[in-house]
Amino acid sequence: MTYCIGIKTNDGLVFASDSRTNAGLDNVNIYSKMLTYDVGDRTVIIVTSGNLGTSQAVFKSIEKDINDKKASISLNTCKDFEQIASYIGKLNTKHSSPDGINTDSLVLGSTFIIGGQIRGQDLELYMVYPQGNYIRPADSKPYLVIGEVKYGKPILDRVITPNVSIGDASRCALISMDSTLKSDLTVGPPIDIAVYKKDQPKISYLKCLNTSDEDYSKVCNQWSEKVLQVFDTFPKFDWEK
């Protein structure tokens, strides 16, 4: 399994994804689930959850189309992010369901979060489903999560709004990821994180973090300590007295 996050704020975008895949307790491997592309007038960040074979095939097709000048469509030629979402959706179903969308689409398909910016256009964030369709997040909850979402979602619900700073969004993403790592053995480090600041030509921060790395540990360790400190200040119930 995996856990991936995409956050959109007024200032930019934050993406995070784990790197663990497993097919049982005795078969655990590490694969990056993030693809980044910032060339020319566009920056695109993609994270994925689901069937590893399908995800890797989609990433390979994206890279092949970028390098093929005769390709009818690629990340280079899409006019906007809705077209990028549609393009990735078609690649998804092509590799998971070559005979057409059916029940295999859910079993063999993958889910993607894509986001970024094309010069002169707004920041964008989309989720692409195994069946090839796609959605944007709600304005009031400007984030998307895929994979093992139940452990890391509460902190996102409490913190993430359109007005949150991109720094706070990044810290929130790390805490969300750490909460999931602590509760689900199918999600594991290293953690890929990408930060894109609005209207910039390149990704601002892109790093693969282990839990011992300072950028990760100084946030997550302090969060754990502060939670315990606050917990100790709760008033006693009357029946405890």
What role is predicted for each listed range?
Residues 48-50, 114-118, 127-130, 148, ...:
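Short, structured patches in soluble enzyme cores that scaffold and shape functional sites
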Residues 175-181:
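Surface-exposed interaction patches
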Residues 5, 167, 182-241:
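Intrinsically disordered, low-complexity segments enriched in small residues
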Residues 13-14, 44, 122-125, 134, ...:
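Hydrophobic residues embedded in beta-strands of well-ordered beta-sheets
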Residues 125-154, 211-222:
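Gly/Ser/Thr-rich active-site loops/lids in small-molecule metabolic enzymes
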Residues 94-126, 132-134:
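Internal active-site segments that recognize and position negatively charged phosphoryl groups
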Residues 4-108, 146-164, 171, 218-240:
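Conserved short S/T/G-enriched processing/targeting/catalytic segments and their helical context
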Residues 2-8, 13-15, 110-117, 124-126, ...:
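Short beta-strand scaffold segments in enzyme catalytic cores
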